[in-house]
């Protein structure tokens, strides 16, 4: 059978949790097989900051994300076409997913305006006026040649209310039809529509229903993890997975905190992406089950342990916390070493969840993970509620009060995550 007869995406559920909505799957793409649930590191401009493709292969990364907005500006469509696509351009043999570019323009550019035609914005490089239409977004993504590509959607701030939310949802549906019409490589690239609707349950349901009428191979859930409360966040995820078809992959955009990943897998999500692992590495922070280690802190000066004794990444095999503390305060190379570890951590977390689902031990995995992650404080109420909604019960812990400012530690942790979310959104 020739390559043109191989479906560009097939998805099979290989195991399901008997309690929650978690499932393990196998997604077969043009360039590689991808085991789900999966975390996709973000290579904004065709590379992860501080990590080369060979290192990603060593970490057994099966799929990464490329940013259409940045790649469309630099190196540009002509360069990508001449190179034969992003895979050849960056020397990456495995799968790539590309976003549409809409989120970056609306969230990062002050002068972006949206109308029915598309997104009008000024280039950050030369201040020239630019227009990104659904058709142009698809043209760029066809040139990039990713295995999975996203429709251009009408993005509004998550906390927006009123008629603008419905307008954006309806426009997103109209735009997916324009994207499908413009898609010139359906035989080897799979286009995902994006579920929008803000924090409005009926709008989310309407959007899912409309998008399911289109002939697509998977679905993305957008417009979340952008400042809404965690209670609203998990409820919208739960609503979407409750209506999306079970035989196609579900991608939750822009989510990367470890606890969020575990909860959303329980709610039925298969795919995730976020810049968080590499961005937090540039601040000298390493990811572990209990949260983050800020290796710039003096307490690590004489700590001769690896970041995580259970991690087999090259950073943990070779370097101590003491050494990483030393270079974190002096050398930029530390961000590369920490990025390797942080990506390895995210990939290992996803692998552990897959294996637990396949053994039908996912609820116990969740309980054990949350006990480690919130070792010194109560599990936040939103996590208990979200897991309870899919029949995973966690014990309610007593609130512990920080004597310094009398704030519950859960509230202080949430403030820290808010800062991290702002950093992620600005990257």
Swiss-Prot record:
Organism: Drosophila melanogaster (Fruit fly)
Annotated spans, Disordered: 395-427
Enzyme Commission (EC) number: 2.4.2.64
Region listing for RNA binding, in residue ranges: 254-260, 278-282
Active site, per annotation: 99 (proton acceptor), 273 (nucleophile)
Protein name from the UniProt record: Queuine tRNA-ribosyltransferase catalytic subunit
GO molecular function list: metal ion binding; tRNA-guanosine(34) queuine transglycosylase activity
The protein's assembly and partners: Heterodimer of a catalytic subunit and an accessory subunit.
Summary of the function given for this chain in its UniProt record: Catalytic subunit of the queuine tRNA-ribosyltransferase (TGT) that catalyzes the base-exchange of a guanine (G) residue with queuine (Q) at position 34 (anticodon wobble position) in tRNAs with GU(N) anticodons (tRNA-Asp, -Asn, -His and -Tyr), resulting in the hypermodified nucleoside queuosine (7-(((4,5-cis-dihydroxy-2-cyclopenten-1-yl)amino)methyl)-7-deazaguanosine). Catalysis occurs through a double-displacement mechanism. The nucleophile active site attacks the C1' of nucleotide 34 to detach the guanine base from the RNA, forming a covalent enzyme-RNA intermediate.
